[in-house]
UniProtKB/Swiss-Prot annotation:
Oligomeric complex that consists of at least the alpha, beta, beta', gamma, delta, epsilon and zeta subunits. The keyword RNA-binding does not apply. One of its GO terms (cellular component) is COPI vesicle coat. It is found in: Cytoplasm; Golgi apparatus membrane; Cytoplasmic vesicle, COPI-coated vesicle membrane. Keywords: Cytoplasm, Cytoplasmic vesicle, ER-Golgi transport, Golgi apparatus, Membrane, Protein transport, Transport. One of its GO terms (biological process) is retrograde vesicle-mediated transport, Golgi to endoplasmic reticulum. The coatomer is a cytosolic protein complex that binds to dilysine motifs and reversibly associates with Golgi non-clathrin-coated vesicles, which further mediate biosynthetic protein transport from the ER, via the Golgi up to the trans Golgi network. Coatomer complex is required for budding from Golgi membranes, and is essential for the retrograde Golgi-to-ER transport of dilysine-tagged proteins. The zeta subunit may be involved in regulating the coat assembly and, hence, the rate of biosynthetic protein transport due to its association-dissociation properties with the coatomer complex. InterPro entries: AP_mu_sigma_su, Coatomer_zeta, Longin-like_dom_sf. It comes from the Eukaryota. It comes from Arabidopsis thaliana (Mouse-ear cress). Belongs to the adaptor complexes small subunit family. This is Coatomer subunit zeta-1.
Length: 177
């Protein structure tokens, strides 16, 4: 029986290697200091590369790390050495594109910190207990709340539950007239 792909962590670091948002799904780094040491080694190994246009891949401490940079943010997804790097790359692209949608294409550290709740919701929509659930950025962003801010959006751009709520609201208004 083939096991589903597993992710060990998702890291979002700033341009100095400091945490913006991180989530670990593995006990490979049991303490906070072990996690920070891993984050530092990942950042140090990748900081001189140019991963601004394409996802890059590297091996570190028996792990595969895929990463991409934008402005002052560095996105990383880590899997075991047996994981398929294309799957890890699709997880990273899904995360990156979902964050871009959620932050309305203004992807930088300040905006990420202001919307940390949406970023962590994105993590939760992509991965559950290390198992990949979703990689489609539109689905991830939709579930994390991109459409909940505009109740006047066309029905075609709303989720089913949001569309039903809007229809119910319109029906209630028309009945009260």
């Amino acid at each position: 029986m083939e096991l589903p792909p597993k992710v060990k962590n998702i890291l979002l670091l700033d341009s100095e290697g400091k945490r913006v948002a991180v989530k670990y799904y593995s006990d490979d780094w049991p303490t906070n200091s072990a996690q920070e040491a891993f984050e530092k080694s990942v950042f140090t190994k990748t900081q001189k590369t140019n991963a601004r246009t394409e996802v890059e891949v590297t091996a570190l401490e028996n792990n595969i790390v895929v990463y991409k940079f934008v402005q002052d943010l560095h996105f990383f997804v880590t899997g075991g050495e047996e994981e398929n790097e294309l799957i890890l790359a699709s997880v990273l692209e899904g995360l990156f594109d979902a964050v871009t949608l959620l932050l309305r294409s203004n992807v930088d550290k300040r905006e990420a910190l202001d919307n940390l709740d949406l970023i962590f919701l994105s993590f939760d929509e992509i991965i559950d207990g290390g198992i990949v659930l979703e990689t489609d950025a539109n689905v991830i962003a939709g579930k994390a709340g991109i459409n909940s801010t505009d109740p006047n959006a066309p029905l075609s751009e709303q989720t089913i539950s949001q569309a039903l709520a809007t229809a119910r609201e319109h029906l209630t208004r028309s009945l009260m007239k």
